[in-house]
């Protein structure tokens, strides 16, 4: 929904008050190129500049499934000067700075440094904030976001998932994914890998993609199988082709934010996996695979390398049973890994996450962070970084004793640039670098749980929480400002999600049967 007040200050004027025609990013337009039409266009742009929020977010989407409810309004990409922030850039050249400015125009980071001038830009006062790149999450089953509280004592993740997989309708998928996307944006997660492993039919894929069109978050949509699908039955490549043509064809509704991938079940179903890999290779789609939280579910990287499949576009998740041969195969092929830190601790019943994390980093594997599911982890990358940092210490008397510990910078890289590398987006996002898209998070540094700040990286990893996030930009759009979502009506999203979750529980029955015949009201 639109903000109740203009979240920005007056335009940055600079010192020169000479009348000059400039483009939307404040760059002077040569006089010889300024005709009557250009003057009218510039005047029109100036007239609408204060109206930062106006286009409906629910723009036309090509799929046949029409979800119920409108999520909010789509902010325009503006011209902004983020002023005076303490900076954690994750760019090795720019580094961390005690006080820096960031110019953003038309979705792109233009320049970064102290005391910048940006004619015509609207200033965001970040003098009491830390600026950092948006987080990049690499493994999230978003269709089940509604089920975050379906679990209970004695009825945990797999039991709750098994009881509800067939109880979702397409509308439930829409509300689940939209809830997850907007929650991610609010928590500073500007990119996510939607690992869709319960595609029950074309209408379900369409519902998820409608949510992505409305969600305004950068993403990979990783199309997969139906939960419970027979091991001998491949995923629906005919529908993947339909999705590619319908949603990612000539006029995608995502504004360049979403790309298509697949998730596969791995060599555990070897004939099916080989057939699926042959189809994926024809389509040149990036791949995500669960690689095991215990010996019985292991998918070994060394075997995948021998098959000729491993590479930078092959994302392995969990990987707890991996040995040195697997790690070296990943290093040779630049294959990334996604660690869902809470899930590894809860579901990794064979143990070993602490040691695997240290060994992967020591070997030089690209390690990224993820949530797995909302019923396994909080959607909170600050906590994921903190857990990884706390676990990342060598244990005396074990085979990790001589390995280097995880440091704060590594924890931040796992949550940002490494995630971007894992999704093939390192040239687009993951650091505050001129030329990259403006996925930026501003964290209040004067809150009780953060102040007084010292080392910036320690502050981000150990003290900050989503509650401290003041402002979020995704692709140069302000989606959160003054701690409030301005791109979406969060109340409507929550109410729709609550109604959908109530319907899923009612259909599932058993221990999930709601105590009230009507959904809770918020």
Language-model segments: residues:
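Histidine-rich, glycine-flanked metal-binding segment
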Residues: 43, 60-81, 86-132, 252
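N-terminal secretory signal peptides
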Residues: 1-34
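Active-site gating loops and adjacent loop-to-helix segments of metal-dependent hydrolytic enzymes
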Residues: 146-175, 229-230, 295-313, 329-337, ...
